[in-house]
């Protein structure tokens, strides 16, 4: 019971960060597939054409 109560806030926070990171990665790959990318990790695909 104690661990559940204690870990709940940190679980929510880490879930938020994890989801944000996953969204960022999926956006990066989506843009890379479309031939444009605003993330340096895309390397030679790094560009932000609209």
Curated annotation (Swiss-Prot):
Q: Which cysteines are joined by disulfide bonds?
A: 37-42, 38-48
- The residues of the propeptide are 8-35
Q: Which GO terms describe its cellular component?
A: extracellular region
UniProt keywords, alphabetically? Amidation, Disulfide bond, Secreted, Signal, Toxin
Q: Which family does it belong to?
A: Belongs to the conotoxin A superfamily.
**Signal peptide as annotated in the record:** 1-7
| Further remark | Found in injectable (milked) (IV) venom.
The PTM Cysteine amide maps to 48
Where, subcellularly, is it found? Secreted
Pfam families the record matches: Toxin_8
Q: Which protein, by its recorded name, is this?
A: Alpha-conotoxin CnIG
| Expression by tissue | Expressed by the venom duct.
Listed InterPro entries: Conotoxin_a-typ
Q: Where is this region: Disordered?
A: 1-26
- Please note every region of biased composition (Polar residues): 1-13
Q: Which residues fall in a compositionally biased region of kind Basic and acidic residues?
A: 14-26
Q: Which organism is it from?
A: Conus consors
According to the UniProt entry, its GO molecular function terms are:
acetylcholine receptor inhibitor activity; toxin activity
**What is written about domains in the entry's comments?**
The cysteine framework is I (CC-C-C). Alpha3/5 pattern.
Answer whether the UniProt record assigns the keyword Transport to this protein: no
């Amino acid at each position: 019971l104690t661990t559940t109560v204690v870990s709940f806030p940190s679980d929510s926070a880490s879930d938020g960060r994890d989801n944000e990171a996953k969204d960022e990665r999926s956006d990066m790959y989506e843009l890379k597939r479309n031939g444009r990318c605003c993330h340096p990790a895309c390397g030679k695909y790094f560009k932000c054409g609209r």
